[in-house]
Structure formats: C-alpha cells, structure tokens
Amino acid sequence: MSKITQRVPHNAMLLIEYYRLMISADLLEYLVGLLVGPVYLDDGAKLPRQYFSLIRYTDDEEEMRAAQVVIKPSGFFSWDNYGKPSAEPQLPLAEWEGVPLLFGEPRYEWINEGKTLLLHADLIASSYYLISRYEEMTHRGQRDHLGRFPGSMSLPVRAGFIHRPIVDEYSLVLRSFLERNGVLASAGLNLESSGNTFTRIKLTHDICRPFWCRGIANIFKGIFYHKYNPFTILRVLLSSPSHDPYYTFDEIFASDKSVIDSFPEGRVQSALFMRTPSGHELDTPNYRLTSPYLYHILSEADKIGAIFGLLCSHRSSQRPRLIPEELKTLRADLAKVYRRLYGWFEEQENKGHAYKQNQKCRRDLELTRSRHSSLALGEPEDVRELLVSGIRHDYSMAYMDSLGFRLGTSRPVRFINPNTRELTDLIMHPISLNASVLINEEISHLRSEDEAYRYCCEVVDLVYKCGGELTLSWQTDLFVKEEHPWIGSLYHRLLDYISKTYGERKEQ
C-alpha cells in the first residue's frame, strides 16, 4: 500500500478519486495511454500524456461533466471487490464493437447535454486484468509441475479469444470510436497513426543444447548412458565446431541477417538467451561461454549484431533469489569473451572495473534481458527479483500448453504487480510464436509444416495489423532434423515471408 500511495499526486481531487477507485494516477495514465496512444494538437505539436484529460475514468457526476469522454468504472478495482471471486469476469462474455468485453456493459450514451460521451464498457479494467496476470494472483492453486499457470485454465482460453490480442483491438476500436464520433475534432486533436507496422521484430533463440557431446561429464554420460560410439565422439571433438551435429548457428544467423537487412536499422534484432550451470536435472547439458565452442558461437553472433540475455535456469525459476547470482556469472563470462574478441578491457584510473569504448559491448554486458527456461516464470511477484538484478526486459510471456497471446496484446507492456497494483519499469515482451509449442501436435493441432506455415503467417499478419512487436522464439537445438523434421525449415520459410511481404529495403 505504501508504494502505491507514494505515487499518488498531491492534488486533493485526484487523491479522493484514487481512494474511491483504488487505482493510482500513474497507472491510470499508463492504461489510457496504452489504449489511446500519443495525442497531437492540430498544429502537429505532441500533447504530453500527463496533460491529456480528454478521457476520464470516473463515476462521479461532477467529474463526468468536466470531461469529453468518460469510461465508467465497473467496480473491479474497489476494495470490497478486488481479488475476490466477485471480481472475476462472467462467462459468456459480452462483446463491444465485436471485441470480447471482460467488464462493464457494451453500450454508450451522450450525457451533459450532448457534451460528454459516456462509455459503459470498462476498457481500463478489462485491459488491466489481462496484462497484469491478475488471474494468476487469484488462482494460486492452479500450477503445473514447473510452477507455471496453465494456459488451459486461463480466461482467454476458456472464453475462446486466446488467438486474439484483444487489448490491441480495444485500442483500435476506441481510437476509431473517438474519431467517428467527432470527439477529437471538437477538441482540436489528432491521434498518432497506429497499426499496419511492426514496432520491432525480435528473433530470439534459447541456447539449451548447443552441442552434441562435449565436456568430461557429458562425454561419460554419452558413452555409458546414451551408448554413443566413443570414436564418433572423439571425431566430433577433434573437428571444427561447425561439424558438431547440434551446431545450427550458421543457418540461424544467416536467416536472421537476411531479415535484419530487409528493414531499417534497429527495427529487427537477433537475440540469444544463455544460461549458466545450475545442477538442476532439466538444465542439461551444462556449458560456459568461456569454452572454445561457445566462444566460436558468440563471435559469429557478434558479426550480425546479435544481443544477449540471461536464460534463467529451472533452478532459479523455482528459487528466484538465485537470479542475481546467475546474472553475475553470465556477465563475468561474457566479459571474458569480449576480452578475447577485442582485447579491450583496460583498467581506468581510479576505477574499480573496466570500460569499453564500443557502445554495443557495454550495453551487452549490462545484460538487461531475460527469459525463463521452459517459460517457467512462476508467481507474478517473482518478477521483482528480475528488477532487483537489473533486468528491464523479460521475454517469457507465452503459455507452453497453448498458442496465442498470453497478455492479450502483441505489444510490450510494463509489468503491473497485481498484488500491489504497482506499475514497474520492467517491460514484458509477449512471444508471438513459440516453436516448442508449434511442434506439439496435441496442443497446436498442426500436423504438417504447411499447416504450421499458414498459421504462423496469419499471426505475423495480425501483429502487423495491430502495430505490435513480433517476437519469435526458436530454440537452437530444434533446428537439428533429428530433434524435429521441419520446424527449422519452417523458421527459414517464415523469415522469408516476413522479408518479402513487409521488408522495407534501405536505399543503397
């Protein structure tokens, strides 16, 4: 409670409104901004969001008269309702302008002698419920063997809209609604164009099994447990990294580079998520970035400008307090790799650590990105360990037992702690397509590469239409044909589709 009240403005009316609705001003401002987007005056000047009073979220009659647009609260945030069964959306859901509505009524009216548009559709509470992972807070007993909230139990799956980013749809419909009813024109305002673009494209790869059989422990396990031929192991060890059966990185980086070159600089990023040794049975094989094999992989990744992040182990997923330790180890190993790559670490006078003139290396060593192994990001409050560690971007937002949009959006959103209703600085990046789910026929119902390709193209088109961030998650070992016959081929076909359909070639 203290963290919330510290963020409440000192204005007496806003303070009263806060205690009545129990939603802080900065959180409300963020949610309105998420739905409406940047606003401009007719002369082209951008209107700061903190001064944007076109839309009010209130049921106070006096407040309503002072606004041009009012979204009427449904009571979701009230103290006697929030966190209780009475706050859950009731199925079947009503629809507002063709979009499932979690809270409120799908209707509007003009009040205040036609000067105020009153929306009874509570888009604020509906959006909050989805992007804050609210139901994971209230359904603590529903977890799988890795501590994950099952997608099959989620409202989007039960209500049948998991394949739709309905928060993005709320935004598109609301913006159209404001323009159609002349609200913006009467106020001398314009909205920034939205949709029909990718804000970013993230090509992400988890390095879970980068090699076939390397390291003393893995060699003994391969010989005595998997019954590998010792001479075959020796031949692979004595060959170059590219001859390892699990070395799929050249083809991955080549495909990623083709998409990177098809868009303006900075629009597309290739990202590798790497873990540190943990001892957990699911975190095998263990590897270190400082080994010659991993060094070769990172040196090739650096050539295409790939960025790096921490793949939190299954151990730290179960014990989040270990995340800072893993991040520290990974950062130290990555520093050693860069020292070998560039020979750049030089102790600065009166400084206790090293610096790099190259800005990319410095940013990489900050390691502000993370993903959890098997997407096993447990309770919503576990996210605070990421924040404490210095992580500012997490890429774990998808279900492992369902395709679709876990947060109800294709856009990155700031994490909201549903326990405290606190708006944080951690950005949650929804995964648009996850190869590990696509290959599970029982979940995806995709029986061939062509079926999967058509589905993936539909998702890509949908994210583009909503103006979202397209994030692909393709584990590197899945490119090995022995692991799966066509998921690697699907990735290359999909990237080719993205480049040819949406690529914006830079002028030569």
Q: What would you call each of these model-derived segments?
A:
Residues 319-327, 379-385, 405-410, 482-492:
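Histidine/acidic-residue-rich catalytic or RNA/ligand-binding cores of hydrolases
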Residues 372, 376-385, 390-392, 396-409, ...:
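A structural motif corresponding to the C-terminal lobe/cap of the Radical SAM core domain
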Residues 271-273, 284-334:
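Acidic, glycine-rich loop-and-beta core segments that form the ion-binding/anion-interacting portion
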